[in-house]
Amino acid sequence: MMHIDEILEYLPHRYPFLLVDRVTEVEKGKSIKGYKNVSFNEPFFTGHFPDNPIMPGVLIIEAMAQLSGILGFVTVERKPSDGVVQYLAGSSKARFKRPVLPGDRLDMESEFISGKRGIWKFDCRALVDGEVVCVAEILTAEREV
């Protein structure tokens, strides 16, 4: 398990763009699980949508990419403090099954599919109360900064 202090060592993101609150499981080179508590106070709810707030799908993809980036860093035993970052390089096969609402806990899972020359491919899904809300394949790219 990784608490927020350790997550901050693996992700360069900060408020309001840090979208992983806790890592619950990580198996180096294989898979990772974590979650984001979706609060009504999230800045994106101000405009998406004022009378019917839902978490933007692109931010669900970003949250899964951040979780996948942690798995990538853990696997290669590097951190941003080593002068590298994991960028979201692409997504495919994204499907949104139902909206994510204020008060939901967005549980996320990512499995490593393949990697070559610093490009990593992950099979991801996000759930709320055990129900799948989003699936996607995510690509991250490790780059020196």
Curated annotation (Swiss-Prot):
Keywords: Cytoplasm, Lipid A biosynthesis, Lipid biosynthesis, Lipid metabolism, Lyase
Single GO biological process annotation from the record: fatty acid biosynthetic process
List of catalytic residues: 48
The organism's place on the tree of life at top rank: Bacteria
Compartments in which it is found: Cytoplasm
EC number(s) stated in the UniProt entry for this protein: 4.2.1.59
Family matches, as Pfam families: FabA
Catalytic activity of the protein: a (3R)-hydroxyacyl-[ACP] = a (2E)-enoyl-[ACP] + H2O
Keyword Phosphoprotein: no
Gene Ontology molecular-function annotations: (3R)-hydroxyacyl-[acyl-carrier-protein] dehydratase activity
Role according to the record: Involved in unsaturated fatty acids biosynthesis. Catalyzes the dehydration of short chain beta-hydroxyacyl-ACPs and long chain saturated and unsaturated beta-hydroxyacyl-ACPs.
PANTHER family, A to Z: 3-HYDROXYACYL-[ACYL-CARRIER-PROTEIN] DEHYDRATASE
HAMAP family registered for this protein in UniProt: FabZ (MF_00406)
Family: Belongs to the thioester dehydratase family. FabZ subfamily.
UniProt-recorded name of the protein: 3-hydroxyacyl-[acyl-carrier-protein] dehydratase FabZ
Organism: Marinobacter nauticus (strain ATCC 700491 / DSM 11845 / VT8)
Gene expressing this chain: fabZ
